[in-house]
Every structure is written in structure tokens, then in C-alpha cells.
């Protein structure tokens, strides 16, 4: 495994991380096999945004005795109040779900406390100009989270996040197709975008990446294969699938 520094944190993460959404609803044996295979092959960073207690508890159980070998991105504002993935900016609700995350994972700290799904100007205001940010900063002061991060799919909003000076880590959607899309594209439209919309690297995204480097803000990548479309002969927006 090749390792790289996560911005100004001084932490080193493997170039391949583990996204855990696919483990939701799977039996414990599958979760354990996946987590252990990741650890055994040098993966030391995982993203856990899912709010359900079952998958959180299964991951916590699988990490038992090896928690110190895996850095965790745990998301603040990710909830399942209606039995499906959802977003809440209610501080009390967010606190309850984050405390449940700690309990389910059998840990007293999360490496990266991520403000969840900050895409629009309204999202930014609700997360960064509210008690939500104060809660995250309090967690960091108490050592419950080691660093503050945020996830976004929008380069304009992501730039505001980085310029706030608050975050050490940005989780952002990056792949050869998304990097060519207009900066105000919605996630669903990006995933299904036709190839004729892609005419070169979007300068807004390029500037975001430069800004992160200048500010020492690390980037972890999501949607690297565009939900699998970029490696699919039938669904790729390019003339042939990536290999």
C-alpha cells in the first residue's frame, strides 16, 4: 500500500480507502470478512456515513482489537429518522446519532468528524453558521474527534468550506467525468451525464484542488468510479470504459 499525508494533520492514509455503504444490510460475517481483508491489506481509512445502528454495530464488532489501525470518517448530520438515509441539521438529533455512532463502534473517539452533505448555500449556512459547527468544535476540543472535515459534491460550496479555515479534510466527489462537469451540476445529473457535456477539466474544480493544497486541507475521494458507470461498457460517458 502506498500512503500519503492527509493535509496538515500529519496523518498518513493509504491511497485506497474503504467506503462502507455496501455493508449496510449485510450479515455480520460479510462485514467482518470485508473489514479484516481491508486491514490485512494495509487499508487504514474508512468512511462511515450510514446512520443505521445494525451496520454501525457490525463494523464496531469487526474492528474489535484493531480499532487503532483504522482511521474513521464519522458523519455528523447523517440520520435515518424515516428508516432511510436522511440529513438533519437539528443539533439535538445530530448529537444523539453521533453519540450512538461512538457506542456502536465501541470507541471513545472518531478520527474525522465530518459535516455531512454540504452541497448548497443553504447547507453551508445550516452546518457552518449554526450550533452544528459549535458542536463539532466542542467535540474536537474534548478529543472526541481528532479533526473536523466535511463532505460535498459541489465545488463552489466546497471552496467556501475550505476558505472557512475550519476543516482539515474535505471529502469530495472526484473522477475523470465529474471533473469536466459544470460547477453547479447536481449529483444525480453528474452520475448520468452524457459524454458531450464533457469538454475538459472544469477550472472551478481545478482551483478548488489547488486551494486545498495551499491551505493544507486533505481530500478524500468519493464517487471515484461514478457509481460504477465509468467502468461499465453500457453506461460510461466516454468512448470506452475505464480500466
What is each residue range found by the language model?
Residues 26-38, 89-106, 152-160, 241-242:
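Short, acidic/polar
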Residues 40-43, 107-110, 145, 167:
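A structural motif
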Residues 16-29, 79-95, 121-125, 232-239:
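Active-site mouth loops of central-metabolism enzymes
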Residues 118-243:
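Beta/alpha (TIM)-barrel catalytic core signal, keyed to glycine-rich beta->alpha loops juxtaposed to Asp/Glu
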Residues 100-124:
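Active-site groove signature of glycoside hydrolases
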Residues 1-74, 135, 141:
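N-terminal binding-site loop/beta-alpha segment at the start of enzyme catalytic domains
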Residues 3, 35, 56-60, 95-102, ...:
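Generic structural signal for well-ordered alpha-helices
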Residues 6, 18, 46, 59, ...:
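Conserved, mostly hydrophobic/aromatic
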Amino acid at each position: 500500500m502506498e500512503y500519503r499525508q492527509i493535509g496538515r494533520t500529519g496523518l498518513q492514509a493509504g491511497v485506497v480507502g474503504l467506503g462502507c455503504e455496501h455493508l449496510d444490510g449485510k450479515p455480520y460475517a460479510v462485514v467482518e470478512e470485508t473489514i479484516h481483508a481491508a486491514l490485512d491489506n494495509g487499508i487504514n481509512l474508512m468512511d462511515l456515513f450510514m446512520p443505521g445502528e445494525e451496520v454501525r454495530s457490525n463494523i464496531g464488532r469487526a474492528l474489535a482489537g484493531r480499532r487503532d489501525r483504522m482511521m474513521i470518517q464519522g458523519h455528523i448530520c447523517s440520520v435515518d429518522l424515516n428508516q432511510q438515509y436522511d440529513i438533519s441539521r437539528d443539533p439535538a438529533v445530530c448529537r444523539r446519532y453521533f453519540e450512538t455512532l461512538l457506542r456502536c463502534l465501541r470507541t471513545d473517539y472518531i478520527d474525522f468528524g465530518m459535516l455531512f452533505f454540504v452541497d448548497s448555500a443553504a447547507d453551508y449556512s445550516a452546518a457552518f453558521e449554526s450550533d452544528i459547527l459549535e458542536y463539532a468544535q466542542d467535540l474536537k476540543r474534548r478529543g472526541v474527534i481528532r479533526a473536523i472535515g466535511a463532505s460535498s459534491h459541489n465545488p463552489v460550496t466546497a471552496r467556501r468550506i475550505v476558505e472557512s479555515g475550519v476543516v482539515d479534510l474535505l471529502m469530495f466527489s472526484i473522477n475523470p467525468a465529474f471533473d469536466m462537469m459544470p460547477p453547479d451540476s447536481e449529483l444525480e445529473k453528474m452520475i448520468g451525464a452524457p459524454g458531450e457535456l464533457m469538454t475538459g477539466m472544469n477550472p472551478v474544480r481545478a482551483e478548488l484542488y489547488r486551494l486545498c493544497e495551499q491551505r493544507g486541507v486533505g481530500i478524500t475521494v468519493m464517487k471515484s468510479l461514478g457509481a460504477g458507470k465509468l467502468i461499465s461498457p453500457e453506461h460510461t460517458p466516454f468512448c470506452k470504459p475505464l480500466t
